[in-house]
């Protein structure tokens, strides 16, 4: 399981500072939000920004969340052009279900994966991973899910089972923790809440999940680094514990 950062966690900081903060977390993997790579940048500016990120030793493993708002080739292509110039192998996205066949066509054309993100009870289109799965299960394999574990548990869904049921359609995962599994406002440092992080990681390993677990730390926006560092320490500790257990069993 590879741990990365969703740069939305660092939304109150400019790109150069966000890069330094990701480096401080000791991971090379970053899922970039448009606040750090604006959609309005010209292709050459996007390439330059991508080089700036890569020169710092970081790897762009995805971007988003990107909203496909219009069911037109022009609008959908704009975001794929953006993702291509930025070197994003995966676009974490949301869209009206009616737009997804068009998105699928561009995913095939550009050979870029699209991971539809579920946003919990407030999301009328995709509250839970199963709502995404229903839409993408017969589409091209590049169409899949980004399971947000915090939003998922708030729908009452068994998050470990949802990960298992998504199988190879699981393309990305947003990690966070909640003290109260029904309350969005109860987000906390990963490991201090009630989300079963250990069972989630165990399931990801059992299915040989090839994507990334990106920390999306939405609290403390003006000083997120201490909580993010604690979250990473906890997640690394869980992975180390699982590795020890695997060695003991073998």
Protein language model regions, located:
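Histidine-acidic metal/acid-base catalytic patches
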Residues: 1-3, 11-28, 126-147, 153-250
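Boundary/entry segment of secreted carbohydrate-active catalytic domains
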Residues: 1-15, 33, 62-67
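Active-site acidic/histidine proton-transfer and metal-coordination neighborhood
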Residues: 16-19, 36, 52-147, 153-156, ...
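Short, conserved active-site loops that position catalytic residues or coordinate cofactors/metal ions
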Residues: 25-34, 58
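Glycine-rich, proline-tolerant flexible connector loops at the mouths of alpha/beta enzymes
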Residues: 31-54
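Conserved residues at the C-terminal ends of beta-strands
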Residues: 33, 66, 94, 176, ...
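Vicinal oxygen chelate
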Residues: 35-40, 66, 184-188
